Structures are given as C-alpha cells and as structure tokens.
A protein has these predicted regions:
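Extracellular glycan-recognition regions
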Residues: 1-191
Length: 191
C-alpha cells in the first residue's frame, strides 16, 4: 500500500517494502503552526497518499519516543494550514497518545500515557469534514482518541508521519497500512 504514497520532507534514511515502511528521522523534523509560543515548523516527515473523498486509514506504528516532541503516527493534510496528526508522542517525560489539529493555529491534545509501550495501531476516518481518530493497543479494540472537524476539500493526503524536533535518529516502523471507504460505525462502537 505504501506504493501510492509520496513524501513531504523526505528523510535522509528510509526504506519502503511492500508491507512495511522504515524511517530514521532527521534532526529538527516537526510539524507545528503558530503555536502558543509562535513556533512554526514544517519539516516533519510525511508519506501521504492522495484521496478525493471520505476514507478510513489505518496503520500500525512502532517507535521509541524518548525526547520531548518525538512523535510517530498518522497525518491527514489539506495544506500547511489545515491538518491533523495523531499517534505516539513524548510529552511530560513519558510516551503518550497525542493529537495535534491545525486550522491556521496548532493545538495539542494529550491522551493516555503509554508507559513502556512502543507500538500501537491508529485509525482515522474522515466523512464530510468530520475526523474520527481512534487508537488501539491490540488492533482489535478501538477507543476514540479525538473527534474533530477539518474543512471539506477536493483533495486530502493521508499517511504515516513522524518527527524528532530536538534530535535525529529515531527509528520508526509503519506496517499494516490500509486505505478504504469510510467505516460507518457509531461513536460507541469500539470495533
């Protein structure tokens, strides 16, 4: 499935196999836009597929996030001003579930601490401008991480994202990437 993806900020070291994408992050790679301290960074690694309508994207992510701001997960992007990224991130001295929504300005939503866990599954469903972000620790049970709005657009890009704003060299493995028509499930449905 990775053969339909194209880079924004291609990392120096990466390998796409039929079922797995391996990345070693470059130094100072990150995505933020007009944050609380005015920071703007558009240097993160994003391997996105183009889609023109609603979808469900899913991926398994393995990353050892150990420095402030390290992250790996899924991104949905319209342009530099309109995007969401969600996944494993290092915040407050521990790996956590994180999401960042950017509608001109970036926010940060911190989810559950992950402890020593370095792997999880992410799923993003986009239907008529509504984003449903789910995270799973086992690939079977999918609790809600975030429900948000993103402008309706003629084209989106969706796929793996990662970055290390304070360092380089984080190894990330993405697998089980899929892209399909949007799942039609109620918010309480954890499947």
């Amino acid at each position: 499935m990775f053969d339909i993806c194209h880079w924004i900020n291609e990392p120096e070291t990466w390998l796409a196999e039929p079922e797995r994408l391996r990345v070693i992050t470059d130094r100072h790679s990150d995505f933020w836009n007009q944050t609380h301290d005015g920071a703007e960074r558009h240097s993160g690694h994003f391997f996105g597929a183009r889609v023109t309508s609603g979808f469900t994207a899913q991926v398994r992510v393995a990353a050892r996030c150990k420095n402030q701001g390290d992250h790996a997960g899924l991104m949905v992007r319209i342009d530099e001003q309109h995007w969401l990224r969600a996944g494993i991130g290092y915040f407050d001295d521990t790996p956590q579930l994180l999401s960042v929504l950017t509608l001109g300005r970036s926010d940060l939503a911190v989810g559950a601490p992950l402890g020593e866990r370095e792997e999880l599954w992410l799923r993003v469903t986009l239907t008529q401008g509504t984003l449903r972000v789910q995270a799973s620790l086992d690939g079977q049970r999918w609790p809600l991480l975030r429900l948000a709005s993103l402008p309706v657009a003629g084209e989106y890009r969706v796929g793996p994202v990662c970055g290390t704003p304070e360092r380089g060299g984080m190894e990330v493995a993405f697998s089980e990437f899929s892209l399909q028509a949007p799942l039609q499930r109620g918010l309480a449905d954890l499947s």
